[in-house]
Amino acid sequence: MAVKSKIKYPQREALRMLLALEQQIDDLTAFESETEYTVGALSTDRYAQFRAKSGEIYTLSIVVKTRVDNLQGGPDKELADRFDRSVVNAQRLIIQASLRFMDVLSKLDVLPLGAREIFTGELRSLYDARERLRDPRLAPFIDDGLEKKIGVAEAVLTTIIEKAPQLMSFTAA
């Protein structure tokens, strides 16, 4: 659903912000492709860096969406489609990184200290990504590969839950 605002933005401002969003997604793509996920202090920090950067992208996407949805002169389908494509690309990247990291966790015989926090964060992240991708505006930009990655991520989460069901204990301690 479009975010309606009394403020109208010049197209050049929306485009400038969209370019910044696309650049951040490109930078995060490079960062993620250079990251080798293993479990240990340094790798966890590296993944935390990825998560922080993806959070910044999400925040910027809110700002960009407000501008794209409230242009002076009315809607611009090309700009809106470009924004929607960027959102899908960001979600694809986040799901891919989550998959890589969860795969590492699922292969461990014993989960590391703090695994509950990591796991619950990944579960939230996967859920949020899936919910964002359910926006009908994004459907034209979602391919079968992304749908498959979401299914794989859910399977990996199931493996982790089966390996350590205590991670999902929600009773008061």
Regions found by a protein language model. Name each.
Residues 2-173:
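Long, low-complexity or tandemly repetitive, helically biased scaffold regions used
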